[in-house]
Amino acid sequence: YNARTFLLSFPAGETSKTQKIKTFLEEQMLKNNCGRDTLIIALGGGVVGDMAGFVAATYMRGIPYVQVPTTLLAMVDSSLGGKTGIDTAQWKNMIGAFWQPKKIFIDLDFIKNLPLEQILNGYFEIVKMSITSNKKLFYFAEKNLRAVQAKNVAVLKHLIIEGLKIKARIVEKDEKENDDRMILNFGHTIGHTLEKLSNYQLMHGYAVG
């Protein structure tokens, strides 16, 4: 298959999740003659996934994209569910769209290179999910904290799979967050406030946890 590819990147972190960056990405796509047959590959953490998904949702009124999350938090949370968007000066994730990825590819090799703070960032999100929906998973996560810190692949794989099962089950019933899906926002009201007050220096998982 003779596909033409090119790479677009932007500075890491929540402060890049802006209209300015979105416009930059869209303008680069236009310069490269991207059409409705274009496929966006979101290779990165949650911010990359959110941005790529929102661009995909709005570019030429919608083009496909796939998620390739490279952080534990993105693997277990933001890559699944179709929530995309950007932040505003007032609040987080206030402009966006529900736009489902065509595929999600999770490669545990990415975890090997993550710093401990990023591992814990995702771990806290898994704990949050388990508190709301799976007591057994909560005890497993609690019992295996040291294994998580040591990047034990078998333990992390189990946590990711079980966390995704929780989220997938809820999203399948309530894709647009009108009812059951709101439970996934547990801890987010306070968490988003803490992130905002820290000028997004505090990671999402830590704020929620």
Language model segments and positions:
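Short glycine/serine/threonine-rich phosphate/pyrophosphate-binding segments
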Residues: 47-54, 75-76, 192-193
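Active-site segments that bind and position negatively charged phosphate/pyrophosphate groups
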Residues: 139, 143-209
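Phosphate-handling active-site elements
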Residues: 31-37, 60-67, 196-206
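Redox-cofactor binding/interface segments in oxidoreductases and associated redox assembly factors
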Residues: 41-42, 106
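A glycine/threonine-rich phosphate-anchoring loop and its flanking beta-alpha core
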Residues: 54-147
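Glycine-rich beta-strand-to-loop/alpha-helix junction loops that act as flexible
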Residues: 12-13, 43-45, 186-187
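Structural motif
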Residues: 8, 42-43, 68
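ATP/NTP phosphate-donor binding region
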Residues: 1-39
